[in-house]
């Protein structure tokens, strides 16, 4: 699974750069641009987190893989909801907080995998 997390982290990083360019040049409204920028920041940090999970997963076991899954689902939910609001004015209900919870769960699972690893 470690190669999958690295590949998904690289994809998320690539899309972060693309979204940053779109946000900087295609959103004329300041409020919408600030909202979208928060999604770009969260996406950037968690792209790096996925790369870290990919490097750690061979030693971190199942908990590390669960952390990677939580990061991916959290990115899709949180950033998707933020981008929908910024670009289309669509309120996605509980999707953003659910995504935020999944991102936090990913960090907790990653930390727990480090504490439980046998080294």
Language model features by range: what are they?
Residues 1-119:
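Polytopic transmembrane helical bundles with strong interfacial aromatic enrichment
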